[in-house]
């Protein structure tokens, strides 16, 4: 913040007062409505140039419900905080409903040996790097299908790839950095199949800004005839989310889509991909859970659910979207309230986070806590009243946060420390005067005052499942 020592006190006072005041609710409501209307025009075919009226308000509410349904949000028909949060995420420019600049006929190539041409390049990457990422993006789609892709350096190609900006002649202008990243057209002649990338974005090969491979692979899905998916783990989900390219495999939802259009590959063994966990799966079990500054995080494979206590909403995200340096399949986690840190564990390694930032010197080995080599992984962990409890198989270890060493008498059986908890623990966190233990599809509420289990229920009740 600028220091205004030379300015008159009165001006300084008014400046500080203005910046300290919250945005008036009516201004915020108007801003959110404009954001919503603009978004719905682009992606849900809300007619343009609509003046405010009761009829148009009803149309906007219906379009909002359609958008909320697509993203798995409560269908309020209002531009609430959760809806605006989704709308402000960077994404693909192809609409989520209807067709994108209709091309005649069925959105499917009649031949499977497709050609592509890279018209120009982004200045942030070398030509060789762009070529490599584009090749990888096409390979993602060729492995599970009968499609092949060959680059041509001149002449006509089925799919033309270009980096362009703003209004570039296809009636679908880009909007500058961090909005619409790219778009592509369904199969057909002329512009059909072509993919355009916003040249004002910063394109990379890693987790910084926008990974070209991930965005290109998504857009080429449109070039092949796929529409957007409601599965948040699918490549064809409209919003951008970083995933580690070196270990990336096409999700099952996308495999099913491309094979529906073009059939399976000729390989005797068909590839399978990861599936997105379903919150209300009756067999769902968490890998880890922790609190973080009032929110609750439930980890599963490469995903986590985030529960907002105030909003009463739960959203599913990629771990890599928030913490690109963390591995998938985390096994334990806990929040140290005194140090305002969250610790996450996998195997014998652990990481320390301050909100979304990795602390220096991590990952470290769990031997720092005093674990012997015989302990190869931690099942769950929770910190309370200066002690951290670690759960390994049927044993409980207790660590003193001040002395930074294990307490005498530990490890001991979990049931001897927490009567009624007679099972292996998958995840645990503390809320009020309770430890919430998760084991398989159930959770146990253990009262820390009465020292007994007071409730046993389904784990996914925490994900708002009926």
UniProtKB/Swiss-Prot annotation:
User: Which residues does UniProt mark as catalytic?
Assistant: 219
Q: Where does Ca(2+) 1 bind?
A: 158, 190, 192, 194
* Example GO molecular function: serine-type endopeptidase activity
The UniProt annotation puts motif Cysteine switch at 90-97
Q: Where do the annotations place Zn(2+) 2 binding?
A: 92, 218, 222, 228
Q: Which reaction does it catalyse?
A: Cleavage of interstitial collagens in the triple helical domain. Unlike EC 3.4.24.7, this enzyme cleaves type III collagen more slowly than type I
Q: For this protein, what does the record note about how its cofactor is bound?
A: Binds 3 Ca(2+) ions per subunit. Binds 2 Zn(2+) ions per subunit.
The cofactor required is: Ca(2+); Zn(2+)
| Sequence positions that bind Ca(2+) 3 | 287, 379, 426
Q: What is its EC number?
A: 3.4.24.34
What biological-process GO terms show up in the record? cellular response to lipopolysaccharide; collagen catabolic process; endodermal cell differentiation; extracellular matrix organization; ossification; positive regulation of microglial cell activation; positive regulation of neuroinflammatory response; positive regulation of tumor necrosis factor production
InterPro entries linked to this entry: Hemopexin-like_dom, Hemopexin-like_dom_sf, Hemopexin-like_repeat, Hemopexin_CS, M10A_MMP, MetalloPept_cat_dom_sf, Pept_M10_metallopeptidase, Pept_M10A
User: Record's GO cellular component, any one?
Assistant: extracellular matrix
- Residues in Hemopexin repeats: 277-326, 327-373, 375-421, 422-465
Glycosylated position list = 56, 113
Cysteine-cysteine disulfides:
280-465
Record text about domains? The conserved cysteine present in the cysteine-switch motif binds the catalytic zinc ion, thus inhibiting the enzyme. The dissociation of the cysteine from the zinc ion upon the activation-peptide release activates the enzyme.
- This chain belongs to which protein, by name? Neutrophil collagenase
Q: Which gene encodes it?
A: Mmp8
């Amino acid at each position: 913040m600028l220091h205004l020592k030379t300015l008159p006190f009165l001006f300084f006072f008014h400046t500080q007062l203005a910046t300290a005041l919250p945005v008036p609710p009516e201004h915020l409501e108007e801003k959110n409505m404009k954001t919503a209307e603009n978004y719905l025009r682009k992606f849900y075919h809300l007619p343009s140039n609509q003046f405010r009226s009761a009829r148009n308000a009803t149309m906007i509410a219906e379009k909002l419900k359609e958008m909320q349904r697509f993203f798995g949000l409560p269908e309020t028909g209002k531009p609430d905080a959760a809806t605006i949060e989704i709308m402000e995420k960077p994404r693909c420019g192809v609409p989520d409903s209807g067709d994108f600049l209709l091309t005649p006929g069925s959105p499917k190539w009649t031949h499977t040996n497709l050609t592509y041409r890279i018209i120009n390049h982004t200045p942030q990457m070398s030509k060789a790097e762009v070529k490599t990422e584009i090749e990888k993006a096409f390979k993602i789609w060729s492995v599970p299908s009968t499609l092949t892709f060959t680059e041509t350096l001149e002449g006509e190609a089925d799919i033309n790839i270009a980096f362009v900006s703003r209004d570039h002649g296809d009636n679908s202008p880009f909007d500058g950095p961090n909005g619409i990243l790219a778009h592509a057209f369904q199969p057909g002649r002329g512009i059909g199949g072509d993919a355009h990338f916003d040249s004002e974005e910063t394109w990379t090969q890693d987790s910084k800004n926008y990974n070209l491979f991930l965005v290109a692979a998504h857009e080429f899905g449109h070039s092949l005839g796929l529409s957007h998916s409601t599965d948040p783990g699918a490549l064809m989900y409209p919003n951008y989310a970083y995933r580690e390219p070196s270990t990336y495999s096409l999700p099952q939802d996308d495999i099913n889509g491309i094979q529906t259009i073009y059939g399976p590959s000729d390989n005797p063994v068909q590839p399978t991909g990861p599936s997105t966990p379903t919150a209300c799966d009756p067999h769902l079990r968490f890998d880890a859970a922790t609190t973080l500054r009032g929110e609750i995080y439930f980890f599963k494979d490469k995903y986590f659910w985030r529960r907002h206590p105030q909003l009463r909403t739960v959203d599913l995200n990629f771990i890599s979207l928030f913490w690109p340096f963390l591995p998938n399949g985390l096994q334990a986690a806990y929040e140290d309230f005194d140090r305002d840190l969250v610790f996450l564990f996998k195997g014998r390694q652990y990481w320390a986070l301050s909100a979304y930032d990795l602390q220096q010197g991590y990952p470290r080995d769990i031997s720092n806590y005093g674990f012997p080599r015989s302990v190869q992984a931690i099942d769950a962990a929770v910190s309370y009243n200066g002690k951290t409890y670690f759960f390994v198989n049927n044993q409980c270890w207790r660590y003193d946060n001040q002395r930074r060493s294990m307490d005498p008498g530990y490890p001991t059986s979990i049931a001897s420390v927490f009567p009624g908890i007679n099972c292996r623990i998958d995840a645990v966190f503390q809320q009020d005067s309770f430890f919430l233990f998760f084991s398989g599809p159930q959770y146990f509420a253990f009262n820390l005052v009465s020292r007994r289990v007071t409730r046993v229920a389904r784990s996914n009740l925490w994900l708002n499942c009926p």
